[in-house]
Amino acid sequence: MSETTYVKQCAYGKTLVRFMKKDICPKTKTHTVYEMDVQSLLTGELEESYTKADNSIVVPTDTQKNTIYVFAKNNDVSVPEVFAAKLAKHFVDKYKHIHGAALDITITPWTRMEVQGKPHSHSFIRNPGETRKTHVVFSEGKGFDVVSSLKDVLVLKSTGSGFTNFHKCEFTTLPEVTDRIFSTSIDCNYTFKHFDTFEELAGFDFNSIYEKVKEITLETFALDDSESVQATMYKMADTIINTYPAINEVYYALPNKHYFEINLAPFNIDNLGSNCSLYQPQAYPSGYITCTVARK
């Protein structure tokens, strides 16, 4: 061990552990599929595996991978927060020198296909415009912390948004607009209250909360007469926190994907202001607005 350095922090695990699980309803024979990417990170009395090459305290990452697969086979995975918590608790309970586990799950969304006007029993279509994630940490003797996410939802509205009365200086060239296209890719994290026990956590309907967070986000985006991205994202977060007492904090990152008016004056065509109907999508640069709203 060096006399001048020490291990300030360490964790290790397995990433990109992918699986798809198929559930079949005994009554209807209807199939449901769940595709997930899982990452595990363990913490505890691990310093000597770094400083003294002591592998006796290393639970192999391959063991962690196998554990994830066995737990996926033998347990319900339909609620990713609960599945992640069960895995995290297992790692800490089983290995005495492991005192914490962080599990991250990313869900690949498959939507049931409609065929001849009816939901098909075993055919699905990939929904590329939405990513659900969860991050669950279990600490020995302290309980669970859960942060879930809605990401990669690309939205646009063609009116109902403006940007005026902003600060101006010698570097300002942006004109004020009372009507503009508002487009963004939604990135939302929502943090739950601390859970002392697995039983308390398992009693929460995380799936319906996820759907409601998405509904509030999209409804606010569509209905708000937006004066700025900042004002709209605050309304989204404020509504979520006031709807769910179990959610203590909401974070949004909303890149402002610009669509600018195309100047057709050289062709004697007015395509500016209220006469604008033709826009040029801008790949970059884009605005990038973030906000974390917390319960008082």
Swiss-Prot record:
InterPro entries (alphabetical): Uricase (IPR002042), Uricase_CS (IPR019842)
Keywords recorded for this protein, A-Z: Cytoplasm, Nucleus, Oxidoreductase, Peroxisome, Purine metabolism
Active site, UniProt feature: 14, 61, 258
Binding site for urate: 61-62, 163, 180, 229-230, 256
GO biological process terms on file: purine nucleobase catabolic process; urate catabolic process; urea metabolic process
Molecular-function GO term, any one: urate oxidase activity
Pathway the protein acts in: Purine metabolism; urate degradation; (S)-allantoin from urate: step 1/3
Catalytic activity: urate + O2 + H2O = 5-hydroxyisourate + H2O2
Enzyme class: oxidoreductase
The keyword Signal appears for this protein: no
Intracellular or extracellular location(s): Peroxisome; Cytoplasm; Nucleus
Keyword Cytoplasm: yes
GO cellular component: cytosol; nucleus; peroxisome
EC number of the protein: 1.7.3.3
Main localization, broad class: other
Family under the similarity heading: Belongs to the uricase family.
Function recorded in the entry: Catalyzes the oxidation of uric acid to 5-hydroxyisourate, which is further processed to form (S)-allantoin.
NCBIfam families (UniProt xref): urate_oxi
Protein name: Uricase
Species this protein is from: Schizosaccharomyces pombe (strain 972 / ATCC 24843) (Fission yeast)
Species classification: Eukaryota, Fungi, Dikarya, Ascomycota, Taphrinomycotina
